[in-house]
């Protein structure tokens, strides 16, 4: 969600792809935001079933295959009228597939990672300055497999910290 507005500002063709989980695309908040921006751009929303799981499992061949399928469903890509020139990565897992996506889409397509907009919004909501005092602390929580998240954190983030399982 936080990357949609910057994507509209960045896009030259005003045709924007959105790769996200099915739950995100179906959420009331996302649908309302999309509706509020409907006149500004055309959005092609693609549910990416299984991509977050493949990233967590570090299954490179599955990541490549899923990214190829999902980008094919969004296209055509390019800088001409009616082509998608910007793709929003609407899940916190998807930046870990950014290199695969960039290779599939080519240099004319901009990938919008939602990490920076999410961090800005979090900082704003918390009311803390960007370089405030105090040490940072990383807490990992998972509703799924704690071991899977621990392995992913070790591989992708190079951090070894305990993972707590939570039930929602």
Where are these predicted regions, by residue range?
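Non-catalytic structural scaffold of enzyme domains
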Residues: 1-168
């Amino acid at each position: 969600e936080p990357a949609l507005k910057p994507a509209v500002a960045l896009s030259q063709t005003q045709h924007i792809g959105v790769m996200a989980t099915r739950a995100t695309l179906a959420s009331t908040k996302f649908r309302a935001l999309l509706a509020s921006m409907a006149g500004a751009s055309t959005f092609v929303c693609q549910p990416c079933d299984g991509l977050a799981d493949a990233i967590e499992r570090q299954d490179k061949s599955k990541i490549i295959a899923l990214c190829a399928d999902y980008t094919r469903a969004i296209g055509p890509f390019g800088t001409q009228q009616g082509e998608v020139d910007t793709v929003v990565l609407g899940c916190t897992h998807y930046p870990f597939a950014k290199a695969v996506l960039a290779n599939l889409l080519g240099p004319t397509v901009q990938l919008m990672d939602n990490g920076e907009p999410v961090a800005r919004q979090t900082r704003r909501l918390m009311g803390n300055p960007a370089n405030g005092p105090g040490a940072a602390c990383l807490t990992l929580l998972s509703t799924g497999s704690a071991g899977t998240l621990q392995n992913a954190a070790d591989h992708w983030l190079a951090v070894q910290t305990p993972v707590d399982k939570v039930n929602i």
